[in-house]
Amino acid sequence: MSNWIDFKQDADTGIESVRAHFVGHAYDPHWHDSFLVGVTEQGVQQFNCRRVRHRSTPGQVFLLEPGDIHDGLAPTEEGFTYSTLYLEPAWLDQQLRALFEHAPGDSLPSFADTLCHDARLARATALAFHTVHNQDFRIVRQTAMDDLLAC
């Protein structure tokens, strides 16, 4: 199977969603201006971030903050597939303030771990991704995103 990328952007929120598959070298070190929340669907996704080498397997969630330099490769011949959401900081701040009545002045999250083994978070991430990527009804997308942010 060769490399492929399926990119979409939500017209209402600006959230970008990417589902991709890579074999071998995936991408060189780079960073994003947005928060990334994604889940590995298939294979082993190996990447370096925050000076640590990570190996994400199906069901694991990866969490990157704006400016986190990371790379990517598939250490096994079947490659890896992942789904990820790119959340703009301004949008995320607005949503967290709407969800949590007593949110502090700067309510943007800080991820203690880049790779997470939380089944509930993985399910919420996958559901939010699918509703945004498949452009479900606005109320369905908003509910799924609220559930993800509440994790």
Please place each PLM-identified region on the residue numbering.
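N-terminal regulatory/effector-sensing and dimerization cores
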Residues: 4-105, 134-137
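An acidic intrinsically disordered interaction segment
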Residues: 1-9, 112-117
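Amphipathic alpha-helical segments enriched in hydrophobic/aromatic residues interleaved with Lys/Arg
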Residues: 100-151
